[in-house]
Amino acid sequence: MKQTTRPPAQYIVAPGTRFRLVANEYDKNKYGQCNYASYRTLVRCKQIRSKEELAKHGGRCEEHVEFSKTLENNHKKEVMRCHAENDSKMQRRRFDPWIASNEYISDDDDYLQAAQTVPQRLPDVANDDILDNNSLRYAEYYTDKDILNIKMDLVQKDIDDLIEFKELVTSQAQKEHELLGNDEEEDYPTDMAQRRIFKASTKYSRNDYLTLTTIDPVFHQCCVGPDMDDSLVIVHTMHSILDKIDNFEPIDSEKQCNKPALHLSKFCFDHIILDRSQKMFDVCNACGLTAIGGVDPKCSFHIKSSAIAETTSCPCNRCVQPGEHASPKDEKNSITCYLNSSDDDEPTLGNLSRIESMVSPMQQFSNQSNTLTAPLPRRYQGPPAQVLRPPQMGPPPGINQVPYQPKANRTPPMTSQQLHEQQKLKMQEEEMMSQTCASDFRVRPIDASQFGGGKKKQRLPPRRSPSFGTSPNSYQFHQQSQKKMPSIISTAYNSSPGKMNFQGWKNQSTSSATRPLPQPRFPVHAARSQQPKMIPLEQTQDSIEDDIGPSPMFQGPEPSRRGVPYYKNAYRRTELPSRHAQHSPLTPSTSTSSSQLLAPPKSPQPGTSSQTFRSQASRLPIAPHRAIAAGLNPADVGTRPAYRSQMAGQRPGMTPSAQQGSPQLISPPRQGSMMPVAMNQSPQAVRRQTPVPPYRLMGPQRVTTSYTVVRSGSSSSVAGPSRSSVASGSQHTALDTVQHDPRLANINVRTFLSIGNRDLSTLTQDEIDLLMAGNSPEKGGRKAGAPGAKESSKAAGGAQKGTSAASTSVPEPTKSSESSVDPQSDVSFSNPSPAPEVIEKVAPAAMTITSNKRKIDETLASESTSSEATLIHDTTSSSSAETVSGEPPAKKSSDVSAPVPSPEKEKEKIDRPKTPKSSTKRTTPTPSGRTPRAAAIAANQAISHSKPNVPSASTSSSAASTDQENPLDLLAELSVAAAAEEQQQAIGSTSKNGGSTKKTQRKSPSRSSIGKKRENSEEYEEEL
């Protein structure tokens, strides 16, 4: 930098002092301040340069121009480093790869660090040497205080560097320790080249690479034979001449050699001498067989003989004098026969694979008896080296799948039948071992011999294997099994967990008795047929009993619960009784799932295949809308209904048992359920029963069977049930049949309720189709019937829509005098007679469709008006009977069955105007504000058609006391009285006014707004 361009100093020494600096005043028109501002401190550079120089470098001084170039070079280095991490060709490393991988230090520049990994408590040391932080970089004079501050800053920087280096080394060691403890691949170092090295060396930390394998060689046939080329013929001729000179048997070339050639050669081990390019093999000096070359080449037989000859002077018992040697020709023939006798084992590898050709130092000084009588055992116990071939490709060509057997002590090969029998016996032994779980062969799980060092000391008992005629004794068989052991011993016998033992690499101190059975080279377990084990069932199962049904006790239905699916107890797999748990029929199964809702369970017994295993008491469910329409809880459909609570095994319609005197024990009803009716109580016990408060009615579940005592002469008998009870009981039976009839699965709800007590078993398929279509054969007859039938159909329709206000029931006929009943007399039950057609139409609509809320309201209303209903019934019984049927009471009392009304009376009823009467006395409305007019008229018509004997005055008091038990009977009597009173007032008003009913209706002052609303609602019901 030239002196002329150097700007004036920013600070100058104050006059008269040596160290005091004051601001220098300069010409701001000629000089200007550098525009560079530090990114970290946001402080502007205070260098002063001429404006011409600042304009050349973009308003910056020369120092910050060089600094910007340095930043640019650092950026380029960072880019190069990022590219180098993704490339395998990396340069020399400046730092250790472990330290470089933790993102604290870079291999290229230690100035660049990852900002997110820098320790937070240390200062940012990346910008310590920036020029704008050194305020004394251009000072010519320094005070002592400035020098001390500079030294202190340098010492503090060294301290910070040492602390940071300590933390870096600590974190590097921690990270290395964690990485070495984890085997997950994502925790490897991030450096690419180092990662490949680390990944390649990980296998050496385990024993995975210690596998005894060889490369699959390419097998070729030996070229010695009649098809040799000219060069081989010349070589063969020369060797034949030399063999004749040496008195050796020449090589026969008339037959083709079938032995495989050695690797990278065209000759087998016996003919490798013909290869002029090989240098490894030579001819034995003693016998002329192939031997490994050397100073004195000898075959394996002569190596052993020379070793024995050298130890003749040894006083050891193992060393004996060698026998007399035969001539070289006989010696060669004997050795050739010995070698050829064992060539069938491994024709693929030839004599080179015979480990016996290499003398073993352990067997070098063995005694003469073992040497001469039996060949020496192999050093490597097991099959030859494995071949790296996929198992689905099978063995290489030329390898037969005969199980490997060593040459020592060769026995005649076993036939296929003997092998099959041996394999069969082995399978039977395995089956017996697998089934004897409590035998002596089982080792308890908690045993010291199964863990740690105790497992190594454990010695398994010798397993007796079947021996055939091939082995003379058991010791010889164990010797064979010892020589047939594979190379890699199973971990269940000789190795610790997680490791493998290789017999060829360490001394085996275990005896032959502890070794497992010999395994074939290519196991045939894949051909075994997996037969299931037959375990006798009579050991684990008791006799299966039929599910007769729930016991007579606890017959009340379950309380109604909300939110329970309606198929709760249906389609369950009935649990078979066993010795562990005897499940009660009322106990629900705990293993019910949606996958088990498949079909009704069948009986597992073969003798009960014709009937369903599920008893008649536990029926299958019906659709939810039909159950709700029938007044049932969909969740309790599968359970036994309350109206069928009879003795176990008793069918509906059967006569009770002979034990009439003892009442049946019935559990108290649950809250929300109904008290079951005692079916086997005597009439006297029923008559003397104290009145109980009314229970909540559950639709068609309650059946009240009343018996009428008829006096005939001196004897008294109990008649059958009344027609109202018969109609209701038969209706329940019909509805229960429809619920489980598969032919009526898609029937309409309205048609389902209007069926009544019809016998569906006699209907044909066409009639059922008409019922399902809504065109019943009785529909046309009902339309042209009596007005009572028309009113009953309206009542049924209104009740189905929720507009009917009452659930009517036919009142029970009262009994005769108590004095006429003899308690000791026999009680006979007559067969139920069919009910009239009107009751058929009224009963389904009146008893099955009412809601629970209206039932409670009507029950309360009937209780409040029970006393008034008794008086009204006594005063108006004769007049109502005379008005409806047109016959005097005296004549009516003599008849047992009600006569059919005459056609004149029916016509008169049809012509009668249907306008409501303007009487001031009306029936007391229910709490819901509606009058049960339609239901009352329907009940009145039903009573008039089946009117029993008029009760006498003596029985009116007892009837009034017993009527309190059934609030529906009181409500029906009240409705009959109200209807009869309306008819009497209508007749009186007609005779007074003379047919001017319209004016009377208009001028009637008793018509209120409530009456108008009732009239409008009734007209709306008729329209619907």
Curated annotation (Swiss-Prot):
Segments of skewed composition (Basic and acidic residues): 903-914
Keywords: Cell projection, Cytoplasm, Developmental protein, Nucleus
Pfam family of the protein (one): zf-C3Hc3H
Coiled-coil stretches noted in the UniProt entry, renumbered to this chain: none
Origin superkingdom: Eukaryota
Sequence segments annotated as region (Disordered): 447-486, 501-564, 577-617, 645-664, 710-739, 773-1024
Bias (Low complexity): 584-600, 710-730, 784-809, 859-870, 916-943, 952-962, 970-986
Positions with biased composition (Polar residues): 467-486, 501-514, 528-542, 605-617, 810-832, 873-883, 987-998
GO CC terms, sorted: axon; cytoplasm; neuron projection; nucleus
Subcellular location(s) of the protein: Nucleus; Cytoplasm; Cell projection, Axon
Cysteines engaged in disulfide bonds, as pairs: none
InterPro entries: Potential_DNA-bd
Primary subcellular site in the record, as a coarse category: nucleus
Chain's role: Nuclear factor that influences the activity of genes involved in vulval development.
The protein, known as: Protein sumv-1
Species: Caenorhabditis elegans
Lineage: Eukaryota, Metazoa, Ecdysozoa, Nematoda, Chromadorea
